[in-house]
Amino acid sequence: MAINFSPKVGEILECNFGNYPVSQNGPFSTTYYDGRIPPEMIKNRLVVVLNGKINGNACIVVPLSTTRDQDKLKRGMHVEIASNVINDLQFFDQQIRWAKADLVQQVSRNRLNRARTYRGYLNQCLPHELVADIQRAVIKSINAISLIN
């Protein structure tokens, strides 16, 4: 169910990014522009909210992934989140995740919902220091590091 509130900075939510459209000749179409195209983010994923008050219908989020990209980690575009930072969830294993700041995007609140725990729904924000690391990684990802040096 979509959220009907303004999420806080650092709040962890679940986002349904959708899937790639299937073509008749292969696994997905790269010429269908009314949907996702590789390498854009897909699937249901955990995200960290960086701005929940863009307007009444949208948020800026950074997706979380369990796939490590060593090159982007070294370049400061991905931020490691230890396995014990995010509370235990019903559909997401408790494991090391990476905030993929190079994939920051605005999404509709209709794509966002609270992740399910075993006894309800997650209501958690990341620690302020970790959110600041993710924000710096976004700045690096858009090649604006000179603004903070």
From Swiss-Prot:
Pfam families: PemK_toxin. GO terms for molecular function: DNA binding. Gene3D superfamilies: 2.30.30.110. It comes from the Bacteria. InterPro entries: PemK-like, Plasmid_toxin/cell-grow_inhib. This is Putative uncharacterized protein YifN. It comes from Escherichia coli (strain K12). The gene is yifN.
